[in-house]
Amino acid sequence: MNPLIMSIILATIILGTTIVMTGSHWLMIWIGFEMNMLAIIPMLMKQHNPRSTEAATKYFFTQATASMLLMLAGIINLMYSGQWTGVKLVNPTASIIMTLALAMKLGLAPFHFWVPEVTQGIPLSSGLILLTWQKLASMTGLYMISPGINLNMLMTMSMLSIAIGGWGGLNQTQLRKIMAYSSIAHMGWMTAILIYNPTMTLLNLVIYILMTTTMFMLFMINSSTTTLSLSHTWNKMPLITTTTLVTLLSMGGLPPLMGFLPKWMIIQEMTKNNNIVLPTIMAITALLNLFFYMRLTYATSLTMFPTTNNMKIKWQFENPKYLSLLTPMIMMSTLTLPLAPMMMILN
């Protein structure tokens, strides 16, 4: 893609997200979402093949439907409150419709079907933006309306997302689909704590973005899209293989790595609010995610598929990109668990 066009697209995506995050007027928030959606579609289609076109079309229809519901909720709120400004929704119907719209944009279950399909059909770089940056605006919207959200509806969607995110990733060999299902599960964890402690949701979002970015950068360095191609990392980059192992385990939430911190803090916060059953179910369901990440770890680092002799010396000729950026990213996404006491004080 032309660098000038790419710069304009990225600037529009950033501007759209910024408008949503700083806006208090429902019409401006809707405009920010529309800018964001229309700007990312060319990035999804930059490979010019039928799969990318199909993925971009699915993304467009889903996001357009969610934007329509968002506008409907804003209009209903206008009818009852008499103003566009103010993010507090005074009408329960408007609150429910707005929650459904933002859940559809985030990819929460039962509106999750588009996430694996779209992620599978686009390049890794576009998948990184879709599963990280594109979550910021929608999660900010949920944060804004969190005081008026229907608790039962939100917790139902959260539990479904955590369960489907774990079950859906079990039989996958495509890395992009695994990351998509992992994203659905992580969104479920974040929205589960939204009612009790919205600030903790934002902290967990930062940790999720950090880990997912690190994971996608490792995939892009190896040009890996399947479990089999990831298993060849030993031959190409032995050092990267070791870091991939640790990052995968962190994504699975294994202590004492950074990925364990969000689950620990969420379970602790929900337990303090006398909610025992749901955190127990969430913790058990999280084992599904850990299982498929352990399977990826085994395929990547603990076994080596049959290869030719030429493949075994490829590591001498590799000059990986992103290495200067990747080192601090890996350290932050795996080794920052000792900062947990400070983060808990901030909450």
From Swiss-Prot:
<feature type="transmembrane region" description="Helical">
    <location>
        <begin position="59"/>
        <end position="79"/>
    </location>
</feature>
<dbReference type="InterPro" id="IPR003917">
    <property type="entry name" value="NADH_UbQ_OxRdtase_chain2"/>
</dbReference>
<keyword id="KW-1278">Translocase</keyword>
<comment type="subunit">
    <text>Core subunit of respiratory chain NADH dehydrogenase (Complex I) which is composed of 45 different subunits. Interacts with TMEM242.</text>
</comment>
<feature type="transmembrane region" description="Helical">
    <location>
        <begin position="201"/>
        <end position="221"/>
    </location>
</feature>
<feature type="transmembrane region" description="Helical">
    <location>
        <begin position="325"/>
        <end position="345"/>
    </location>
</feature>
<keyword id="KW-0999">Mitochondrion inner membrane</keyword>
<feature type="transmembrane region" description="Helical">
    <location>
        <begin position="276"/>
        <end position="296"/>
    </location>
</feature>
<keyword id="KW-0812">Transmembrane</keyword>
<keyword id="KW-0520">NAD</keyword>
<dbReference type="GO" id="GO:0008137">
    <property type="term" value="F:NADH dehydrogenase (ubiquinone) activity"/>
</dbReference>
<feature type="transmembrane region" description="Helical">
    <location>
        <begin position="178"/>
        <end position="198"/>
    </location>
</feature>
<dbReference type="GO" id="GO:0005743">
    <property type="term" value="C:mitochondrial inner membrane"/>
</dbReference>
<dbReference type="GO" id="GO:0032981">
    <property type="term" value="P:mitochondrial respiratory chain complex I assembly"/>
</dbReference>
<dbReference type="InterPro" id="IPR001750">
    <property type="entry name" value="ND/Mrp_TM"/>
</dbReference>
<keyword id="KW-0249">Electron transport</keyword>
<keyword id="KW-1133">Transmembrane helix</keyword>
<comment type="similarity">
    <text>Belongs to the complex I subunit 2 family.</text>
</comment>
<feature type="transmembrane region" description="Helical">
    <location>
        <begin position="127"/>
        <end position="147"/>
    </location>
</feature>
<dbReference type="InterPro" id="IPR010933">
    <property type="entry name" value="NADH_DH_su2_C"/>
</dbReference>
<feature type="transmembrane region" description="Helical">
    <location>
        <begin position="96"/>
        <end position="116"/>
    </location>
</feature>
<feature type="transmembrane region" description="Helical">
    <location>
        <begin position="3"/>
        <end position="23"/>
    </location>
</feature>
<feature type="transmembrane region" description="Helical">
    <location>
        <begin position="25"/>
        <end position="45"/>
    </location>
</feature>
<keyword id="KW-0813">Transport</keyword>
<feature type="transmembrane region" description="Helical">
    <location>
        <begin position="148"/>
        <end position="168"/>
    </location>
</feature>
<dbReference type="InterPro" id="IPR050175">
    <property type="entry name" value="Complex_I_Subunit_2"/>
</dbReference>
<keyword id="KW-0830">Ubiquinone</keyword>
<dbReference type="GO" id="GO:0006120">
    <property type="term" value="P:mitochondrial electron transport, NADH to ubiquinone"/>
</dbReference>
<keyword id="KW-0496">Mitochondrion</keyword>
<feature type="transmembrane region" description="Helical">
    <location>
        <begin position="247"/>
        <end position="267"/>
    </location>
</feature>
<protein>
    <recommendedName>
        <fullName>NADH-ubiquinone oxidoreductase chain 2</fullName>
        <ecNumber>7.1.1.2</ecNumber>
    </recommendedName>
</protein>
<keyword id="KW-0472">Membrane</keyword>
<keyword id="KW-0679">Respiratory chain</keyword>
<dbReference type="Pfam" id="PF06444">
    <property type="entry name" value="NADH_dehy_S2_C"/>
</dbReference>
<comment type="function">
    <text>Core subunit of the mitochondrial membrane respiratory chain NADH dehydrogenase (Complex I) which catalyzes electron transfer from NADH through the respiratory chain, using ubiquinone as an electron acceptor. Essential for the catalytic activity and assembly of complex I.</text>
</comment>
<dbReference type="Pfam" id="PF00361">
    <property type="entry name" value="Proton_antipo_M"/>
</dbReference>
